Curated annotation (Swiss-Prot):
Name of the protein: 1-(5-phosphoribosyl)-5-[(5-phosphoribosylamino)methylideneamino] imidazole-4-carboxamide isomerase
Primary gene name: hisA
Chief location bin: cytoplasm
InterPro entries hit by this protein: Aldolase_TIM, His_biosynth, HisA_bact_arch, Isoase_HisA-like, Isoase_HisA-like_bact, RibuloseP-bd_barrel
GO terms for biological process, alphabetical: L-histidine biosynthetic process; L-tryptophan biosynthetic process
Highest taxon of the lineage: Bacteria
Subcellular location: Cytoplasm
Active-site residues, Swiss-Prot/TrEMBL: D8 (proton acceptor), D129 (proton donor)
Species of origin: Listeria innocua serovar 6a (strain ATCC BAA-680 / CLIP 11262)
EC number: 5.3.1.16
Length: 240
């Protein structure tokens, strides 16, 4: 299982949120470039970067910093936050970003997601952010009436290769991932699934790995020391 250390960017700094609440922001590193380099030096093989400013503004805001992070880390990066157009995807991929995450637009503009997948294939991941099983949009500010399972099935029909599933109610809480929902997703679709939200320990990563998932994202638990980079490396290797 691929494990992605997470770096969330706000105002040029590396931050963590609690349940996606922008008012509950904690700065974990003022230098995201150094953070990316540190993760890679400690064994990270792929980074997950979210442009929170971009998610709010609906356009890439921190691309220059993200480019510097990739250059410093020398590992692949996937980036999400505010990606709403083909021009923005072109912008990221031509700048050396390895995979782009389409979030809210996957629900609000399915034609856009389909066009992106048709053009870029595996370089596109679709994000599903949900609360109590219902899909959220616009930086998690709006909750729809669409089931996460239904949206995943629609994405599979569009030939999406990778879905990143975030349980908002668990994100940044260290309460453990929603194993029931991830298991349901794994049964419902056959594409690559990446779990995000709530990972609090090495045992959580091992439990996700046992579900047969393609990947998992670790954020807050890495920053507060609940999970070490050596834990990540060992779980990744044992899962193959």
């Amino acid at each position: 299982m691929q494990i992605f250390p997470a770096i969330d960017l706000k105002n040029g700094q590396c931050v963590r949120l609690f349940q996606g609440d922008f008012s509950k922001k904690i700065i974990v590193n003022e230098d995201p470039i150094a953070q990316a380099k540190s993760f890679a030096k400690s064994g990270a093989t792929y980074l997950h970067i979210v442009d929170l400013d971009g998610a709010l503004e609906g356009r890439p805001v921190n691309l220059e910093i993200i480019q510097q992070m990739k250059k410093a880390a020398k590992v692949p990066v996937q980036v999400g936050g505010g990606i709403r157009s083909m021009a923005q995807i072109d912008y990221y991929l031509q700048s050396g970003i390895d995979r782009v995450i389409i979030g809210s637009a996957a629900l609000t503009d399915p034609d856009f997601l389909q066009a992106a997948v048709k053009k870029y294939g595996s370089k596109i991941a679709a994000g599903i952010d949900a609360k109590n099983g219902f899909v959220a949009t616009s930086g998690w500010l709006n909750i729809s009436q669409v089931s996460f399972l239904d949206l995943a099935k629609q994405m599979e029909a569009m030939d999406v290769e990778t879905i990143i599933y975030t349980d908002i109610s668990r994100d940044g809480t260290l309460t453990g991932p929603n194993l029931e929902q991830m298991a349901a997703l794994q049964k419902h679709v056959t594409i690559n699934l990446i779990a995000s939200g709530g990972v609090s320990s090495r045992a959580d990563l091992e439990a996700l790995s046992e579900l047969g998932l393609y990947g998992a994202i670790a954020g807050k638990a890495l920053y507060n020391g609940n999970i070490s980079m050596s834990d990540i490396v060992e779980v990744e290797q044992s899962a193959y």
